[in-house]
Structure formats: structure tokens, C-alpha cells
Amino acid sequence: NVNDIFEFANTVDIKHIKELLDMQINYNIAIAKEGLNGEYGVGIGKMLMKCYPNSIITKLKVYAAAASEARMSGCSLPVMTNSGSGNQGMATSIPVIIYAKEKGLTEEELYRGLVFSNLITIHQKTGIGRLSAFCGAVSAGCASGAAITYLEGGTLEQINKTVTNT
């Protein structure tokens, strides 16, 4: 449950999972940058950045959209998945990574935010099942929103409301 995930994210010894989280950061940000610099899809990320260049919220969307467009348009760069999906892995991690960097958070805070986001995504997926009409990227987006609430020092009640209302 969310309480256990919150407790784990706060107490896990990061050294045991640092290598995995570094791979997630490096792979998923690399494809996001490729999506912004290359010609993939219709260029949603680039268009958003032109319309709203100074917004942190826009930047979260821009990088996630650019990564997804690159992946879905055949970019061969690897990504770190979540629950077996590349788009879920990117939506789970990229907003958290960009948010932490934009806010000047520590490396440890970033890692704990990623732990929280990844586990919330997995937790939500357990209630959906293997086959569903529900797109798992929505769970991942919800999880990254909850992780941002977590990174802002949100209480369990606030985090639960983020999950419920996303």
C-alpha cells in the first residue's frame, strides 16, 4: 500500500539500488533529449516548449512527450521500463528526474523520488491486471505526480489525494 511504499522510499539503503536508478536516469533522459533534438512524430514536446518555454510543469510534459514520441517512432535507444512497458517507465521517471533537477534537489532526494514513483506505478498495476483497456501510462503519470508531492514533503494524506485525483 501507499503507506508501505512511503516508508520504504524513506528508509531504503540507496546504495543497493543506485546502479539501477542511474540506468533509469541515463537511459530515459537520453531518449527524451533525442526526441527533442531529432525528428520524431509530430513534435509535441518541441511545440509545447515553444508555447510555454519558462514553465517547470511544461518542461516535465515536454521531456516525457519527446521521449514517448521518439520511442513510438522507432528510435533505437534503450529505455528503462516499468511493469514491462517503456512508456510507463518513461512516464514514471522523466517528470521526477526533471523536477528534481529544476528544483536543485540532492541526488539522494532524486533517488528516493524515483523509488517512490516506480513502486506506486507497480502498486497501481497490481489492481489493473495483465490485460486491460486502461492505459498503464496513466498509472505512471499518476505515480510521478505522487512522487513530486512526496519530494515536496507532502504528507501521506496529500500523497493519497494526489493518487486519487490524478
Residue map of PLM features:
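Signature of multi-pass transmembrane helix bundles
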Residues: N1-G74
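Conserved structured core elements
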Residues: D22, N54, T58, G89-S93, ...
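Acidic-glycine-rich active-site phosphate/pyrophosphate-binding loop
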Residues: S55-G74, T106-K125, Q158
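Generic structural marker for isolated residues within well-ordered, non-membrane alpha-helices
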Residues: K61, V96, G145
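Fold-independent oxyanion-binding glycine-rich loops
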Residues: A67, I94-Y99
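Conserved phosphate/anionic-ligand binding catalytic regions in large, soluble enzymes, centered on
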Residues: C75-I94, C135-S139
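Hydrophobic alpha-helical bundle architecture
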Residues: Y99-R112, I122-T166
